[in-house]
A protein has these predicted regions:
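N-terminal [4Fe-4S]-dependent radical SAM core
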Residues: 1-40, 53-59, 179, 186, ...
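Receiver (REC) domain switch/active-site residues of two-component response regulators
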Residues: 141
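Cysteine-centered iron-sulfur cluster-binding motifs in ferredoxin-type domains/subunits
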Residues: 36-51, 91
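P-loop/Walker A phosphate-binding loop and immediately adjacent motor/lid segment at beta-alpha junctions
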Residues: 95-110, 153-198
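Conserved Radical SAM active-site core
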Residues: 12, 16-22, 35, 53-117, ...
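Residues at the C-termini of beta-strands that transition into short coil/loop
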Residues: 25, 119, 147, 171
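Short Gly/Pro-enriched loop/turn and capping motifs at secondary-structure junctions
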Residues: 122-124, 148-152
Length: 198
């Protein structure tokens, strides 16, 4: 079990992010609840052993995030059957320069859509992080937190790869000042397809 662990505020999006993404996948069913559009950003410093997507570690990988792509994301998200947007990577919270404007726009123009994000940070670490990360967190509905730990791998977990990771209701957690687990947690009853990406 190895990974990198930052000191609070050590990793700064404005210093690391190159404004790039690995992929954008519209209309999928595996990255959260319902039909979702998933944005995979480039760059991650955690480097979890057994990571399913090592290709996302480099901040220079992939393609530039563009205004044209953002318009496509918004158009896809506007479809009535799409429940929301999912932010993955790479590490979304090290790409706040891209994601904060996008998420703010979604909140303004498509406020009925939900936003999920995965992160290598734990909730407790996030509470000690930089203002940009905390602002992005405040705009998200559901957070899957924590590093992937291959010694705790479990394919029966819903939307997670290892049992140390949690599915957190962000708004309830922020309001209550402590972690509140997503009330639709359904471990062991989801298909392999929903967890295989971990």
């Amino acid at each position: 079990m190895t990974w990198n662990t930052p000191k609070p505020g050590e990793w700064k999006s404005e210093e690391l992010s190159q404004g790039r993404i690995i992929d954008y996948k519209a209309f999928n069913f595996v990255d959260g609840e319902g039909v979702r559009n998933s944005l995979y950003v480039s760059g991650c410093m955690f480097h979890c052993e057994g990571c399913y997507n090592v290709a996302t570690w480099s901040f220079n990988a992939g393609i530039p995030y563009t205004a044209e792509l953002e318009e496509q994301i918004m158009a896809d998200l506007a479809q009535p059957y799409v429940q929301g947007l999912t932010l993955l990577g790479g590490e979304p919270f090290l790409n706040t320069g891209i994601l904060l404007p996008l998420v703010k726009r979604i909140r303004k123009e498509l406020s009925d859509k939900d936003i999920w994000s995965w992160t290598g940070y734990t909730w407790e670490e996030m509470m000690l992080e930089t203002p940009d990360k905390l602002e992005l967190l405040s705009l998200i509905d559901i957070l899957v937190d924590g590093r992937y730990d291959r010694t705790k791998r479990n394919l029966m977990l819903q939307f997670r790869g290892s049992s140390n990771q949690r599915i957190i209701d962000v708004q309830k957690s922020l309001k209550g000042g402590q972690v509140v687990i997503w009330d639709k947690l359904n471990d062991g009853k989801e298909s392999y397809e929903q967890v295989k990406r971990e």
